[in-house]
Amino acid sequence: MKIGFIGTGNMGTILIESFIESKAADPSNMTITNRTIEKALHIKNRYNSINVTESLEKLVSENEMIFICVKPLDIYPLLARALPYLRKDHILISITSPVQTEQLEQYVPCQVARVIPSITNRALAGVSLVTFGTSCGESAKAKINELMQHISHPLQIESDITRVASDIVSCGPAFMSYLIQRFIDAAVSETSVSKQDAILMCKEMLVGMGKLLETELYTLPALQEKVCVKGGVTGEGIKALESGVQDMFHRVFQNTHMKYEEDISAVKKQFHV
Protein backbone atom coordinates (compact mmCIF):
# COMPACT_ATOMS: atom_id res chain seq x y z
CA MET A 1 0.00 0.00 0.00
CA LYS A 2 1.28 3.45 -0.93
CA ILE A 3 1.03 6.12 1.75
CA GLY A 4 1.30 9.88 1.40
CA PHE A 5 2.08 12.39 4.14
CA ILE A 6 1.16 16.05 3.89
CA GLY A 7 3.14 17.86 6.57
CA THR A 8 6.47 16.84 8.09
CA GLY A 9 6.30 18.72 11.37
CA ASN A 10 6.78 17.02 14.74
CA MET A 11 3.95 14.48 14.58
CA GLY A 12 4.17 13.91 10.82
CA THR A 13 7.85 13.09 11.17
CA ILE A 14 7.20 10.82 14.15
CA LEU A 15 4.67 8.82 12.12
CA ILE A 16 6.97 8.58 9.09
CA GLU A 17 9.98 7.45 11.13
CA SER A 18 7.96 5.01 13.22
CA PHE A 19 6.30 3.35 10.23
CA ILE A 20 9.67 2.89 8.55
CA GLU A 21 11.55 1.62 11.60
CA SER A 22 8.73 -0.76 12.59
CA LYS A 23 8.66 -2.02 8.98
CA ALA A 24 4.98 -1.14 8.77
CA ALA A 25 5.77 0.51 5.44
CA ASP A 26 8.71 0.57 3.07
CA PRO A 27 10.04 4.08 2.46
CA SER A 28 9.90 3.46 -1.30
CA ASN A 29 6.11 3.21 -0.93
CA MET A 30 5.87 6.51 0.94
CA THR A 31 5.62 10.01 -0.51
CA ILE A 32 6.02 13.11 1.63
CA THR A 33 5.55 16.81 1.13
CA ASN A 34 5.74 19.93 3.25
CA ARG A 35 5.08 23.62 2.78
CA THR A 36 8.79 24.16 3.47
CA ILE A 37 10.13 21.39 1.24
CA GLU A 38 13.57 21.47 2.92
CA LYS A 39 12.01 19.77 5.97
CA ALA A 40 10.84 16.89 3.80
CA LEU A 41 14.24 16.67 2.11
CA HIS A 42 15.85 16.44 5.55
CA ILE A 43 13.89 13.20 6.10
CA LYS A 44 15.02 11.91 2.70
CA ASN A 45 18.62 12.42 3.80
CA ARG A 46 18.01 9.65 6.36
CA TYR A 47 15.71 7.44 4.27
CA ASN A 48 17.04 7.74 0.74
CA SER A 49 14.32 5.71 -0.99
CA ILE A 50 11.44 7.81 0.37
CA ASN A 51 9.73 9.95 -2.26
CA VAL A 52 9.57 13.73 -1.88
CA THR A 53 7.34 15.94 -4.00
CA GLU A 54 6.21 19.55 -4.09
CA SER A 55 3.14 18.54 -6.13
CA LEU A 56 -0.03 17.99 -4.12
CA GLU A 57 -1.65 16.46 -7.21
CA LYS A 58 1.14 13.89 -7.51
CA LEU A 59 1.03 12.98 -3.82
CA VAL A 60 -2.75 12.53 -3.74
CA SER A 61 -3.06 10.80 -7.11
CA GLU A 62 -0.30 8.25 -6.53
CA ASN A 63 -1.15 7.15 -2.98
CA GLU A 64 -4.04 5.15 -1.53
CA MET A 65 -3.78 6.34 2.08
CA ILE A 66 -3.07 9.99 2.87
CA PHE A 67 -2.15 11.37 6.28
CA ILE A 68 -2.87 15.07 6.81
CA CYS A 69 -0.37 16.27 9.40
CA VAL A 70 -0.96 20.03 9.42
CA LYS A 71 -2.44 22.50 11.92
CA PRO A 72 -6.25 22.46 12.36
CA LEU A 73 -6.91 25.74 10.54
CA ASP A 74 -4.66 24.70 7.64
CA ILE A 75 -6.74 21.61 6.83
CA TYR A 76 -9.70 23.30 5.11
CA PRO A 77 -7.61 25.31 2.60
CA LEU A 78 -5.45 22.24 2.00
CA LEU A 79 -8.51 20.11 1.20
CA ALA A 80 -9.76 22.80 -1.19
CA ARG A 81 -6.55 22.31 -3.18
CA ALA A 82 -6.58 18.50 -2.91
CA LEU A 83 -10.27 18.02 -3.70
CA PRO A 84 -9.93 17.68 -7.51
CA TYR A 85 -7.56 14.72 -7.07
CA LEU A 86 -9.37 12.78 -4.34
CA ARG A 87 -11.12 9.56 -5.39
CA LYS A 88 -13.79 7.53 -3.65
CA ASP A 89 -11.28 4.76 -2.84
CA HIS A 90 -8.82 7.08 -1.11
CA ILE A 91 -8.36 6.76 2.68
CA LEU A 92 -7.92 10.24 4.13
CA ILE A 93 -6.61 10.45 7.71
CA SER A 94 -6.42 13.61 9.80
CA ILE A 95 -4.26 13.57 12.93
CA THR A 96 -5.64 16.73 14.56
CA SER A 97 -8.29 16.57 17.29
CA PRO A 98 -10.50 19.66 16.59
CA VAL A 99 -11.40 18.54 13.06
CA GLN A 100 -14.21 15.97 13.17
CA THR A 101 -14.63 13.12 10.71
CA GLU A 102 -18.16 14.39 9.93
CA GLN A 103 -16.72 17.71 8.79
CA LEU A 104 -14.24 16.03 6.49
CA GLU A 105 -16.90 13.71 5.07
CA GLN A 106 -19.10 16.64 4.09
CA TYR A 107 -16.26 18.05 2.05
CA VAL A 108 -14.43 15.12 0.41
CA PRO A 109 -15.68 12.14 -1.65
CA CYS A 110 -13.42 9.54 -0.03
CA GLN A 111 -13.19 7.41 3.11
CA VAL A 112 -12.23 9.38 6.21
CA ALA A 113 -10.71 8.62 9.61
CA ARG A 114 -8.97 10.49 12.40
CA VAL A 115 -5.88 9.03 14.06
CA ILE A 116 -4.37 11.00 16.94
CA PRO A 117 -0.83 9.75 17.61
CA SER A 118 1.43 10.19 20.63
CA ILE A 119 5.13 10.90 20.91
CA THR A 120 5.34 7.51 22.66
CA ASN A 121 4.58 5.91 19.28
CA ARG A 122 8.14 6.87 18.32
CA ALA A 123 9.25 4.07 20.67
CA LEU A 124 6.67 1.77 18.99
CA ALA A 125 4.66 1.98 22.21
CA GLY A 126 1.73 3.83 23.72
CA VAL A 127 -1.77 4.41 22.37
CA SER A 128 -3.07 5.97 19.16
CA LEU A 129 -6.65 7.25 19.16
CA VAL A 130 -8.74 6.16 16.18
CA THR A 131 -12.12 7.50 15.05
CA PHE A 132 -13.62 6.11 11.85
CA GLY A 133 -15.95 8.14 9.69
CA THR A 134 -19.23 6.60 8.49
CA SER A 135 -17.68 6.51 5.01
CA CYS A 136 -14.88 4.21 6.18
CA GLY A 137 -15.39 0.66 4.92
CA GLU A 138 -14.29 -2.49 6.73
CA SER A 139 -11.29 -2.94 4.44
CA ALA A 140 -10.10 0.61 5.13
CA LYS A 141 -10.62 0.16 8.88
CA ALA A 142 -8.55 -3.03 8.82
CA LYS A 143 -5.74 -1.31 6.90
CA ILE A 144 -5.63 1.59 9.35
CA ASN A 145 -5.67 -0.68 12.40
CA GLU A 146 -3.00 -2.97 10.96
CA LEU A 147 -0.75 -0.01 10.19
CA MET A 148 -1.16 1.59 13.61
CA GLN A 149 -0.65 -1.74 15.43
CA HIS A 150 2.96 -1.69 14.24
CA ILE A 151 3.70 1.42 16.29
CA SER A 152 1.01 1.59 18.99
CA HIS A 153 -2.05 0.16 20.63
CA PRO A 154 -4.82 1.65 18.44
CA LEU A 155 -7.84 2.51 20.59
CA GLN A 156 -11.11 3.33 18.86
CA ILE A 157 -12.89 6.26 20.53
CA GLU A 158 -16.04 8.29 20.00
CA SER A 159 -15.85 12.03 19.35
CA ASP A 160 -17.22 13.02 22.77
CA ILE A 161 -14.05 11.90 24.60
CA THR A 162 -11.57 13.11 21.99
CA ARG A 163 -10.14 15.92 24.10
CA VAL A 164 -9.70 14.05 27.39
CA ALA A 165 -8.28 11.03 25.54
CA SER A 166 -5.83 13.31 23.72
CA ASP A 167 -4.88 14.97 27.01
CA ILE A 168 -3.95 11.59 28.47
CA VAL A 169 -2.35 9.97 25.42
CA SER A 170 -0.81 12.85 23.46
CA CYS A 171 -0.39 15.68 25.98
CA GLY A 172 0.26 13.32 28.90
CA PRO A 173 3.96 12.76 28.12
CA ALA A 174 4.54 16.55 28.17
CA PHE A 175 2.58 16.91 31.43
CA MET A 176 4.51 14.07 33.08
CA SER A 177 7.81 15.41 31.71
CA TYR A 178 7.11 18.80 33.27
CA LEU A 179 6.31 17.23 36.66
CA ILE A 180 9.44 15.06 36.57
CA GLN A 181 11.59 18.09 35.74
CA ARG A 182 10.16 19.91 38.76
CA PHE A 183 10.83 16.76 40.84
CA ILE A 184 14.47 16.81 39.69
CA ASP A 185 14.86 20.55 40.29
CA ALA A 186 13.51 20.20 43.83
CA ALA A 187 15.85 17.28 44.56
CA VAL A 188 18.86 19.34 43.43
CA SER A 189 17.69 22.43 45.35
CA GLU A 190 16.91 20.64 48.62
CA THR A 191 19.84 18.18 48.72
CA SER A 192 23.44 17.72 47.57
CA VAL A 193 22.55 15.39 44.68
CA SER A 194 23.88 16.52 41.29
CA LYS A 195 21.43 17.31 38.51
CA GLN A 196 23.10 14.72 36.29
CA ASP A 197 22.59 11.96 38.87
CA ALA A 198 19.02 13.09 39.61
CA ILE A 199 18.16 12.96 35.90
CA LEU A 200 19.69 9.48 35.56
CA MET A 201 17.84 8.16 38.61
CA CYS A 202 14.50 9.59 37.47
CA LYS A 203 14.92 8.28 33.94
CA GLU A 204 15.72 4.77 35.11
CA MET A 205 12.92 4.91 37.69
CA LEU A 206 10.41 5.82 34.95
CA VAL A 207 11.66 3.10 32.61
CA GLY A 208 11.52 0.53 35.40
CA MET A 209 8.06 1.65 36.48
CA GLY A 210 6.81 1.36 32.90
CA LYS A 211 8.19 -2.16 32.60
CA LEU A 212 6.68 -3.08 35.96
CA LEU A 213 3.24 -1.86 34.87
CA GLU A 214 3.66 -3.74 31.60
CA THR A 215 3.97 -7.02 33.52
CA GLU A 216 0.58 -6.25 35.14
CA LEU A 217 1.96 -7.46 38.47
CA TYR A 218 0.65 -4.27 40.05
CA THR A 219 -2.05 -1.72 39.38
CA LEU A 220 -1.12 1.90 40.10
CA PRO A 221 -2.85 1.87 43.54
CA ALA A 222 -1.25 -1.49 44.39
CA LEU A 223 2.18 -0.20 43.39
CA GLN A 224 1.74 2.84 45.63
CA GLU A 225 0.62 0.62 48.51
CA LYS A 226 3.66 -1.67 48.12
CA VAL A 227 6.09 1.25 48.32
CA CYS A 228 4.22 3.32 50.89
CA VAL A 229 5.01 1.41 54.10
CA LYS A 230 2.97 2.53 57.12
CA GLY A 231 4.92 5.09 59.14
CA GLY A 232 7.64 5.37 56.48
CA VAL A 233 9.10 8.31 54.57
CA THR A 234 7.08 7.64 51.40
CA GLY A 235 3.88 8.34 53.31
CA GLU A 236 5.21 11.73 54.41
CA GLY A 237 6.02 12.55 50.80
CA ILE A 238 2.50 11.51 49.73
CA LYS A 239 1.06 13.94 52.31
CA ALA A 240 2.97 16.79 50.65
CA LEU A 241 1.71 15.69 47.24
CA GLU A 242 -1.88 15.52 48.45
CA SER A 243 -1.78 19.08 49.76
CA GLY A 244 -0.04 20.35 46.63
CA VAL A 245 -1.99 18.56 43.90
CA GLN A 246 -5.56 19.12 45.15
CA ASP A 247 -7.53 20.23 42.05
CA MET A 248 -4.46 20.72 39.84
CA PHE A 249 -5.38 18.09 37.27
CA HIS A 250 -8.99 19.27 37.22
CA ARG A 251 -7.66 22.66 36.15
CA VAL A 252 -5.45 21.02 33.54
CA PHE A 253 -8.48 19.39 31.89
CA GLN A 254 -10.53 22.58 32.22
CA ASN A 255 -7.81 24.60 30.46
CA THR A 256 -7.29 22.11 27.64
CA HIS A 257 -11.03 21.77 27.05
CA MET A 258 -11.43 25.55 26.95
CA LYS A 259 -8.74 25.81 24.24
CA TYR A 260 -10.27 22.82 22.43
CA GLU A 261 -13.66 24.54 22.26
CA GLU A 262 -12.00 27.63 20.80
CA ASP A 263 -10.29 25.50 18.15
CA ILE A 264 -13.53 23.65 17.33
CA SER A 265 -15.36 26.96 16.92
CA ALA A 266 -12.70 28.26 14.52
CA VAL A 267 -12.81 25.03 12.48
CA LYS A 268 -16.63 25.13 12.31
CA LYS A 269 -16.47 28.58 10.74
CA GLN A 270 -14.32 27.16 7.96
CA PHE A 271 -16.37 24.03 7.31
CA HIS A 272 -19.73 25.76 8.00
CA VAL A 273 -20.73 22.78 10.12
From Swiss-Prot:
Dispensable for transformability. Not known if it can act as a pyrroline-5-carboxylate reductase. Belongs to the pyrroline-5-carboxylate reductase family. One of its GO terms (molecular function) is pyrroline-5-carboxylate reductase activity. Transmembrane segments: none annotated. The gene is comER. InterPro entries: 6-PGluconate_DH-like_C_sf, NAD(P)-bd_dom_sf, P5C_Rdtase_cat_N, P5CR-like_CS, P5CR_dimer, Pyrroline-COOH_reductase. One of its GO terms (biological process) is L-proline biosynthetic process. It comes from the Bacteria. It comes from Bacillus subtilis (strain 168). This is ComE operon protein 4. It holds the Pfam family F420_oxidored.
